[in-house]
Amino acid sequence: MEETPPPMQAGSKPHLEKLTLGVTRILESSPGVTEVSIIEKLPAERHMISSWEQKNNCVMPEDVRNFYLMTNGFHMTWSVKLDDHIIPLGSMVINGISKLTQLIQSSVYSLPNAPTLADLEDDSQEGNEDHQLEKPHFDCRSAIFELDSCGGNGKVCLVYKNGKPGLAHDTEIWFLDRALYWHFLTDTFTAYYRLLITHLGLPQWQYAFTSYGISPQAKQWFSMYKPITYNTSLLTEEPDTFVNKLDPSKVFKSKNKILIPKKKGPVQPVSGQKGPGPLAPPTSKPSAGCGNPVRK
């Protein structure tokens, strides 16, 4: 049985800091982030790995083996504080060996004449955008083991492409969404672990590797806490709709015209102007007549 000690602060032990690739310091320095913690797990014993390989008839890849020899699973969480309310947000999970179980038909489909996972093979071909890669099969052609249940948003799986006996070099990491469509993630477990850490365990981050992307709600969290080395252009729902593509040289073209000043005419004198103005021409008074004066 796996032990589940109480969560510890991320920076309390040096080996935990090494395990998280230093991402804890980034989270703790981010605004609003609180309660960054890791559930410390003991290393798996070698006989546990050998027992898993014998039980499942699969050889565990070397990087997966080395991971379990360092820690029997991984669980790191962090929360955000908004308006005095603490909201759990980030979650990074790698199942321990006892939970690294094969993905098989659920008991829900065990009723007579009920559809099986194998019946979805033809339908799932439509949802696979990785046409150059052979997708996993739910039947004996592939051996699929669950690494993370993604909080009910899908499943991250370790896939042995050629079924059993499973060889270590035939493994890949795939994401199975809620519609049971497969999406390729990485060639190796090490590459996937780096993706998990650099995406900070944000909700639904695996959907960034699908054709339909993350949900609008998840985009809001991605905008607030951008994953490390994340392509921010994916946060735009429809670039053609929301990105303003105006050409400034055309918009302000009319302002670049040379204005020709108009010529001004002579200034007319103002009647109320102070100071000496132009002299009016003299006016002659009418005379009574010429020659002798008139007698009464």
Swiss-Prot record:
Compartments, record wording: Cytoplasm, Cytoskeleton; Cytoplasm, Cytoskeleton, Microtubule organizing center, Centrosome, Centriolar satellite
Keywords, sorted A to Z: Cytoplasm, Cytoskeleton, Microtubule
A GO cellular-component term linked to this record: cytoplasm
Domain of life: Eukaryota
Spans annotated as Disordered: 257-296
Primary subcellular site in the record, as a coarse category: cytoplasm
Keyword Cytoplasm: yes
Record bears the keyword Cytoplasm: yes
PANTHER family membership: TUBULIN POLYGLUTAMYLASE COMPLEX SUBUNIT 2 (PTHR31854:SF2)
Biological function: Subunit of the tubulin polyglutamylase complex (TPGC). The complex mediates cilia and flagella polyglutamylation which is essential for their biogenesis and motility.
Subunit composition and interactions: Part of the neuronal tubulin polyglutamylase complex which contains TPGS1, TPGS2, TTLL1, LRRC49 and NICN1. Interacts with CSTPP1 and LRRC49.
Protein name: Tubulin polyglutamylase complex subunit 2
Organism: Rattus norvegicus (Rat)
Lineage: Eukaryota, Metazoa, Chordata, Craniata, Vertebrata
